[in-house]
Amino acid sequence: MKRRMFFSIILTFLLITTSFVLAQKEWVTVSESQWQGSFSDVFFFDAQNGWIVGSNATILNTTDGGKTWTHQPLPFNTEFKKIRFINAKTGWVVGENGTVLKTLDGGKSWMKLSTGTLVALLGVSFVDEQNGWACGDGGFIMHTTDGGATWTPQPIDTNNTIEGVHFVTPQIGWAAGGGGTLLHTTDGGNNWQFQTSATVNTLDAISMLDHANGWAVGAGGAVVSTVDGRNWEVQQSNVPNSNGMPEPIWDVHFADKNVGIAAAEFGVILTTMDGGITWKPLEHRPVAARLQGVHMISDSEAWIVGDKATILHTTDGGNTWDVVSNANELRAVHFFNDELGWAVGLAGSVMHTSDGGDTWRPQNSGDVFELFGVGFVNEMKGYIVGSNAALLETLDGGTTWKSVSDPGDEGHGRAKRIKFGGDMSWKSAMASYAMSFGNPTHAWAVGETGKVMRTSDGGKTWVGVDIDPGFSGAGFNNLFGVHFVDEKVGWIVGFGGTVAKTTDGGDTWSITIGYAELQDIYAISSELAWAAGNQGTIMVTTDGGETWIDQTVPTEENINAILFIDEKSGWTVGDKGTILRTTDGGVTWLQRNSPTTNNLRDIIKTPNGTLWIVGDSTTILRY
């Protein structure tokens, strides 16, 4: 009797403990950017003290060489453009609506100065605690001789926007801007004289080492330089043409007469070791965001900032860069097994884990546009789909990705692997928004204007599929979600409530239209499936799509992805950190605690049962 009571007590204890553990299981944040928004400029007074400014009145400060960054809150919302310090305590920030801020304590507190203008200020330069200049829209330059307490506009003979200004003494300075404008003054800006820039491209930034040596950069990959402060010559930037034309260069900074770094569009970083005679683009871009500000502390150490809260740091002269911050939007995640996973997103971003998600590292996709779907055939071979007709392939686990869709690459035999019938072409098909593997050899991708592709040989060839030969309208709708149960049975959903189903591997399709805009679908069998979409839409079919029943959902947020473990257990994720769960096939959906308010884009399950979610601001969650 005592033994039976003892085992009863132990069993009760184990049940209570197990229930407590299960009740306590929550989603855990593996990755999430600390910062959001766009960073426009970075400035270091010395190796330890630095500042970053950007959108939403953002000012970040470090006093330990960038190991930690502290946000300096302000009681207003303005987009800041440039920041400059003349010592570790005294600095100025300029931005939209004629905004000028000043600090005397290293940024612990900021005072807003009266400027008498609402012009968007884009550049600022101070040579000491009293003498400074700011420039902006409409050919605007203003000057202060009392540290910013009062400002006086200076007349210049142009209406072109002045993007940057740089003074080396209280008398000698330069300004650069629209239409290749270059201005020079030797009397503190009382008189500005035009200099020939040798380009008609907008010059977005100017950086002078001294009274003679300087560089200006801008649109169309323009780089011009001077060695005497008067005559400017064009330098060949060798900037890539990611979008069919040379990338704009947004900023440039030199450590000395030889070593310089330029920051450009789509994550392009240029370095020179000979004063710009030769510029070398970084082969593997750490990010693909717009890079707007660069500052060199020495010939080896530099910082770059840009869109998507990007902060980059190098200690080897720009050969390699650490990604300190990047708030990219991750759109899809895929695990081939419990250890190997990939997440893809905007600006060509690819994240990879080889340790079950404990650590994620960027991979270079070679693409700079949006990536929406990813899938792997085996540990080495995988595919990514995205905008601009992107179809990328890797044969080495993501170390290198190559396009299999570039018509200009037919000489290498890759473009011929894309086969479309009739009037359809790869380029006219535009973006792909999702992909699904029915098995290791059969995969599907869907996208813009009814685009559907399939492979039945593990990606060796991809064939275009017309799901709407009867012209019901679905063939022109954007398709956002696809899920195949096996190589024969699959579902597609999209704009206008489009639902398409095949039971013969895509040879024929049944189509219905008229539900809310649907973003994703998950099927357990040819009969049982759930679809999810905008404004909290979740619906279920138990008869193969003949009828759909709306399910009650405790949110009106857009639902972006849906996953079912079995016929009863399912999850959805959506905007503003929405996570829903059901344990009864969707009869009831309950809101789960979410560790983020970022939009969540995808959810998947690994073979061992671990769940993964990805979303905006490089959010990665594990359950």
Question: What label would you give each PLM region?
Answer:
Residues 23-623:
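Residue-level hotspots at or immediately adjacent to binding/recognition sites across diverse folds
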Residues 9-17:
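Bacterial N-terminal signal peptides
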Residues 1-7:
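Bacterial N-terminal signal peptides that target proteins for export
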